[in-house]
Amino acid sequence: MSDFQREQRKNEHVEIAMAQSDAMHSDFDKMRFVHHSIPSINVNDIDLTSQTPDLTMAYPVYINAMTGGSEWTKNINEKLAVVARETGLAMAVGSTHAALRNPRMAETFTIARKMNPEGMIFSNVGADVPVEKALEAVELLEAQALQIHVNSPQELVMPEGNREFVTWLDNIASIVSRVSVPVIIKEVGFGMSKELMHDLQQIGVKYVDVSGKGGTNFVDIENERRANKDMDYLSSWGQSTVESLLETTAYQSEISVFASGGLRTPLDAIKSLALGAKATGMSRPFLNQVENNGIAHTVAYVESFIEHMKSIMTMLDAKNIDDLTQKQIVFSPEILSWIEQRNLNIHRG
């Protein structure tokens, strides 16, 4: 594939993603908090700091991996980096493979560090990238963490995608052992299972982003790029973010779990944190805001999002993220069925 074709593919991904809408039915709507009428705290008491063994985020919300690798996506990364700088959010760039192959493309990613020199930035590579390239990806952005995206359904629907996956787990293990910053194993919208969590724990992984279905749909994106658009029947493949978080429950004491995929509102973010996530990521909401409404409006959107999270936590009488994990939740029969059939041990305060 030529560099021009890769740039074109990057732009196609963004164009199709922006045109997508959230799933009509979300598993976030299948879980409810129990309301208690008189909080014992005030809004100003809320501490939204997200703390993991290696990363401290001012807020448990981050701009998730999206793009880079073309002139248009450079402009997007520049604007998102300004939003991150002005709001204190962490930010992940999209796959840096284009820059690792072609130094001419490096600026489409490094613009994020240029515009946000003191901020928290996650670099991003695929599960098949050599260890040396993973190290380069971290150095390229002076990144505080490295996302490794695992995207086998996307690759298999992508006309020119990868068809070989047998080395992925061993390669991830090699990267985790060599890279000095936290390595986050990131799905891309298909969710994670307890079996995967077991495998990742065995090779020393300490961070995952479950990225469940319900948000940006890469099966649909790649199917749109197929000549016959003949794989639309896989549109609903995978686990939702709620299901994925429940799958991780037994591993949350050893692995820091981030949640993304289909988060629409501050309430969805709070529900994710209550299910054990340490932070929540969103991609398309930020992309649409910054492209359609500009930087200032997106900054205001983030500030409002954070204030709404504080309001919800006050209603829940939760001073911090750890408190949220003790709050009572009522699940729908469908979610309860998933818990039962998957033999998940869910114990709450």
Swiss-Prot record:
GO terms for molecular function: FMN binding; isopentenyl-diphosphate delta-isomerase activity; magnesium ion binding; NADPH binding; oxidoreductase activity. FMN binds at A65, M66, T67, S95, N124, K186, S211, T216, G262, L263, R264, S283, R284. It comes from the Bacteria. It catalyses: isopentenyl diphosphate = dimethylallyl diphosphate. Its cofactor is FMN; NADPH; Mg(2+). InterPro entries: Aldolase_TIM, FMN-dep_DH, IPdP_isomerase. One of its GO terms (biological process) is isoprenoid biosynthetic process. Mg(2+) binds at E155. Signal peptide: none annotated. Its EC number is 5.3.3.2. Substrate binds at R9, K10, S95, T96, H97, Q154. Gene3D superfamilies: Aldolase class I. SUPFAM superfamilies: FMN-linked oxidoreductases. NCBIfam families: IPP_isom_2. PANTHER family: ISOPENTENYL-DIPHOSPHATE DELTA-ISOMERASE (PTHR43665:SF1). Belongs to the IPP isomerase type 2 family. This is Isopentenyl-diphosphate delta-isomerase. The gene is fni.
